[in-house]
């Protein structure tokens, strides 16, 4: 998975991610600190998604960022 966008711009993107995934806490984002795999795990935990769904959600978020450029 290409995690360059999320990893490289974590601070700037955190607000957008919090708006999209409101069940994640500030602490979740602090611990994740740019780690997309950890973020996927938290999405699974908070939303009850399987691994594929969480991965799809993160990829779709990354794609939306690329498309917005």
UniProtKB/Swiss-Prot annotation:
<dbReference type="InterPro" id="IPR036629">
    <property type="entry name" value="YjbJ_sf"/>
</dbReference>
<protein>
    <recommendedName>
        <fullName>UPF0337 protein XCC3924</fullName>
    </recommendedName>
</protein>
<dbReference type="InterPro" id="IPR008462">
    <property type="entry name" value="CsbD"/>
</dbReference>
<dbReference type="InterPro" id="IPR050423">
    <property type="entry name" value="UPF0337_stress_rsp"/>
</dbReference>
<dbReference type="InterPro" id="IPR026042">
    <property type="entry name" value="YjbJ"/>
</dbReference>
<dbReference type="Pfam" id="PF05532">
    <property type="entry name" value="CsbD"/>
</dbReference>
<comment type="similarity">
    <text>Belongs to the UPF0337 (CsbD) family.</text>
</comment>
């Amino acid at each position: 998975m290409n995690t360059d966008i999320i990893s490289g711009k974590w601070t700037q993107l955190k607000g957008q991610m919090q708006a999209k995934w409101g069940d994640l806490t500030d602490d979740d984002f602090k611990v994740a600190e740019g780690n997309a795999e950890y973020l996927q795990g938290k999405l699974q935990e908070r939303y009850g998604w399987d691994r594929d769904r969480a991965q799809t959600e993160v990829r779709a978020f990354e794609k939306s960022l690329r498309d917005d450029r």
